[in-house]
Structure formats: C-alpha cells, structure tokens
Amino acid sequence: MSAENAAQAEKVFPPYFETAVAIRRKAIKVYRFMKELLATVKENKRIAEGIWAITLTLPESVGEIKGGQFANLSVGDSAYPLKRPLGICSAEGNDVTLCYQLKGEGTHLISQKEAGEKLSVLLPLGNGFDLGNAKNVAVIGGGVGIFPLAAVVRQHAGAVNFRSYIGFRGKQYACLEDVFSKGGSLTVATDDGSMGMKGNAVGAFLSDYNEGAADLIISCGPPVMLRALKEALKERGIKTKCLVSLEERMGCGIGACLVCVCKKSDGHNARVCKDGPVFDINEVEL
C-alpha cells in the first residue's frame, strides 16, 4: 500500500486501519523471535498409517526450540502458497523433525519430497509448553496430538519423570511409542482395542490417576478429547495445573490473519498461533 493510499484508508476507515496497523506491528515484533529459512530435506518417511515424519536441515541455528512449538512449512508448489503448520517432534543441532498426517493435497505434496530438495520453513512458532519446576508430569495425547508432546518428553527426559497416556484409533496408526517410553511409564490405548487397552487416552489417564502423583498435566489432541479431559478434571475435583495445546486451522502462523482465533473463558479472543497454541485448560473454551 502506498503512503497516499494508506492515508486515504486511514481517513475513510479509521477503526479498521488502526486495528490493521496494530496487528502488523505485533506481527513484526513476533518475527524477531523466528526465522524463515530455506531448509534441505534430510529424510521424509512414513512412520504409521497416513503418518509421516520429515527431517529438515536448517542452514543456520534458530536458537532453542521448546516442546510444543511448531513450524510453517511450504509444500514446494506455487499453486499452494500457504504454508502448512506442522508439529515439531524433535530438534537436534540444525536438524528439525516435523511429523504430519496426510490430510489434503498440501500434506500429500510434502510427503513426496525427497532428500536434497529445498523447502521454505518458518520457525519456531507459538509459545510451547513451560514445565516450570514440575518433576512429575502426566502426558495425555490423542492421534496427531502426540507430536508436540513427544518433543516435550525428548527435551526433558531424565530431568522429569513422565507418565504418558497416548491414544490412537487402531494399532496401524500408532507411532513414537519409543519416545514416550524413554521418558517414563507409557500406557497406550486404541479405540478398537488392537493395541494396549481399549479406550482412549483420557480414560487411560483417569483409570491410573493417583492424587498428588503429578505436579503438572500436559495434553494435546482433538477438541472432543480436550473437552472430555476438562470435564473429567472438574467432575473429579482434580486441581493439578493442566496445559493444553489446541489444534486449529491456521493461515499466517504469526497472529496477523486471525484465522485461528479461539474464545477464552473471560470472553476475550486469543490467537492460537501466537498467544498459544499452549493454554491453561481453564483459560479457554473447548
């Protein structure tokens, strides 16, 4: 927008112009803490039915990546300009592994990328999980929601004792069990009972719950799972702090487009990509 057009817009639509400027300034502020890089595909493989893991080698360091943060990855096709938000499963040196589910043309195109190809990636995005001083953490993940949780367990294994409860639709969709088992105890649940206990991750957690056993609960999964968890904690009077990572459709990844807005318990809105994706379970409506 030229200076002349901007001035005209400010006169005609002052409230809207001020909002747009404020969002733009906030977006620029966020950019200081992340980088858009041209990464090289190191490995791209199927790890379960419809689930893939792509490892990218970054040309430079992006600093510390917290478990629960995510990346916006280009699909490598000009016909699909929007980057896809993918969970960061691990970060070692300049190698970053993103896990994703084949769901639509964009992720299908990503799955076809081979070692040596270049892809634009914007990272790290979001706030991630802050474990604070917690030493005993209950982990509850469902489906693709286990990806950011796996990064947390990897990052803190040895320093924190994790009790993980992860759920899948069936055995064919199970993945990353080795990561969670290295962090502590692991219970797997499947909807059809083909692996582990029959049921879901929330049910597995509740059946094993002992008061005082966890300093903190962290969770990520589909909205129906998070709602069930929130209701169960309330019904059982469980006061342990619970942090959840929300799954929402995203556009820009920096809080400017407002596609991923969620409602907070106080009536205000929050942008999942910038203000989250991790929130206290009692601070957001699910």
Locate predicted features.
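Ferredoxin-reductase
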Residues: 32-115
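Short, charged beta-turn/beta-strand-edge "cap" motif at the junction between a beta-strand
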Residues: 76-80, 123-128, 266
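FNR/FR-type flavoprotein reductase catalytic core
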Residues: 105-249
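Local cysteine-cluster metal-coordination motifs and their immediate loop/turn environment
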Residues: 223-224, 247-277
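Short hydrophobic alpha-helical segments enriched in small aliphatic residues
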Residues: 3-6, 18
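Short Fe-S-cluster ligation motifs
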Residues: 274-286
